[in-house]
């Protein structure tokens, strides 16, 4: 019998770890590596078995499964010409695939190299080990309790700044939607933010998932008596923040209520459709043969390791997807929507409205980040699907336009170089730095994710050491005020970043929701930290 190997994750019980010579230990994440390092236990990081080229191959392979729902066997999930299975957030799907495929290929390479007789592993990778073990004589032990896995938007991080500290509270998607509906109803009724259907025949601009305080000047410039402006935010409520409400009010930007659009017949049809597609889902999960063919790489089906994840997410969200299709279709039929603006095209909100829009409705994708500026990152930037976007793309500069045309073969007339509605205002702001008696240094770390395959122990170590090093450097200057601005994403690495900062000093202010423009305006020096760098 071959030797024993142990896989450890953050959820593993480390009290049973053996230190025998014939046992080899592999850590699966940064925290388990740190814990063993502190205990002085010899181990290897599993990720070291994958090189950069292999991670890039996994990234490109994962992208090929983005359109899995287009398989002819899944056409039964089309509702009003929209496939409900295709409404899953593209970033969520890609992150799931990257998480699973990276660990899948890592475990495969280790098992091929070590040929163990005994495998000890955490519960969450048992399916992978069972799928990859070469014979039934291999003994498998589980070293953790059952772990409930979730996708990014299964729970919502409700965030708020309290006395300079970011406070977050996780709530379920269902509870979040209920709270959001109550908040929208109360605030919109109080401040007159509801769209008046009397104006439905006037040309209307529809804005998707844009946070008003960040785009205050942009929204103010859109204010006009000639057309309506409606904003729809599902991921981040626009009525939760006082400044957001103020911006909406001043720019005459309105919210739309589903209750104003749905009649009794609509409600009945929606209810029947929810029941119909929920039943189809129950039948779908028994169709393993079809899924084995869809989710296959190099002759190996990885369907067993993602089945439960997709089953859970669609079971939870199918009713939401059905209702969102009816809402979008009704909106386009009752209101004269002439144009759509969005920052993304892969989110659930964006997908449903872009798929449901009438052919005469123009859509504009506003550039959001810097990644396309760099030759080395152009492969990863395809997650934004610029190359597949059907309508117009608005970018910051002619340089960006030329980059898209030359690297993604996008037609030049589809790209408009108009500047950045978010960042252009910075050049016109008057600095308030003189108000600060100290030299303010703003550090803005971007959290690590597995989206591009960068979530490695080595990157986490470099990230932590860099944050601590910067804190130590500026601590020596008494006239320096150090502040941090954390990206307001759903990434779990944000909690790790906060912990690193607070363990160093609880006195350092950490911001999450404050508009970055205001923080930059009041700072003398800005330092960004990114996983890619």
Q: What residue ranges belong to the model's regions?
A:
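Catalytic-core helical/loop segments in enzymes performing group transfer/polymerization on anionic/lipid-linked
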Residues: 1-533
């Amino acid at each position: 019998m071959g030797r024993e190997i142990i896989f450890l994750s953050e959820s593993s019980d480390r009290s049973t770890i053996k230190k025998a010579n014939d046992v080899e230990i592999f850590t699966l994440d940064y925290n388990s590596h740190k814990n063993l390092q502190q205990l002085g236990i010899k181990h290897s990081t599993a990720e070291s078995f994958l090189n950069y080229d292999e991670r890039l191959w996994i990234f490109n392979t994962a992208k090929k499964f983005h359109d899995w729902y287009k398989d002819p066997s899944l056409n039964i999930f089309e509702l009003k010409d929209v496939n409900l299975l295709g409404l899953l957030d593209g970033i969520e799907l890609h992150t799931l695939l990257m998480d699973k495929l990276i660990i899948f290929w890592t475990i495969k390479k280790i098992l091929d190299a070590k040929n163990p007789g005994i495998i000890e592993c955490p519960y969450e990778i048992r399916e992978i080990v069972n799928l990859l073990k070469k014979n039934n004589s291999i003994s498998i032990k589980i070293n953790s309790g059952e772990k409930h896995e979730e996708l990014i938007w299964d729970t919502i991080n409700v965030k708020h700044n309290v006395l300079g500290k970011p406070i977050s509270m996780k709530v379920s998607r269902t509870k979040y939607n209920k709270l959001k509906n109550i908040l929208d109803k109360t605030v919109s009724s109080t401040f007159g933010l509801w769209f008046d259907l009397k104006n439905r025949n006037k040309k209307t601009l529809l804005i998707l998932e844009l946070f008003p305080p960040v785009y205050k000047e942009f929204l103010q410039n859109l204010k006009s008596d000639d057309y309506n402006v409606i904003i729809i935010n599902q991921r981040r409520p626009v009525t939760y923040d006082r400044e957001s409400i103020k911006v909406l009010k001043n720019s005459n930007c309105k919210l739309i209520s589903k209750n104003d659009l749905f009649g009794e017949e609509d409600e009945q049809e929606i209810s029947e459709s929810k029941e119909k597609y929920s039943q189809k889902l129950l039948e779908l999960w028994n169709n393993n043969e079809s899924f084995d063919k869809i989710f296959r790489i190099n002759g190996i089906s990885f369907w067993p390791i993602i089945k439960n994840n997709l089953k859970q997410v669609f079971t939870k969200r199918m009713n939401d997807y059905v209702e969102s299709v009816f809402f979008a279709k009704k909106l386009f039929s009752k209101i004269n929507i002439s144009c759509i603006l969005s920052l993304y095209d892969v989110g659930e909100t964006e997908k449903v409205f872009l798929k449901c829009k009438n052919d005469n409705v123009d859509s504009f994708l506003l550039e959001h980040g810097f990644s396309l500026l760099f030759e080395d990152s152009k492969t990863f930037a395809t997650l934004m699907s610029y190359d597949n976007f059907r309508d117009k793309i608005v970018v910051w500069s002619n340089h960006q336009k030329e980059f898209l045309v030359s690297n993604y073969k996008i037609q030049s007339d589809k790209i408009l170089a108009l500047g950045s509605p978010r960042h252009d205002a910075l050049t016109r702001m008057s600095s308030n730095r003189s108000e600060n008696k100290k030299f303010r240094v703003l550090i803005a770390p971007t959290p690590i994710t597995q989206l591009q395959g960068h979530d490695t122990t080595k990157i986490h170590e470099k990230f932590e050491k860099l944050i601590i090093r910067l804190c130590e450097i500026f601590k020596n200057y008494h006239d320096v005020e150090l502040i941090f601005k954390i990206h307001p994403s759903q990434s779990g690495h944000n909690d790790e970043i906060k912990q690193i900062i607070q363990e160093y000093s609880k006195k350092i202010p950490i911001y999450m929701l404050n508009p970055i423009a205001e923080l930059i305006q009041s700072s003398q020096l800005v330092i960004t930290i990114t996983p890619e760098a």
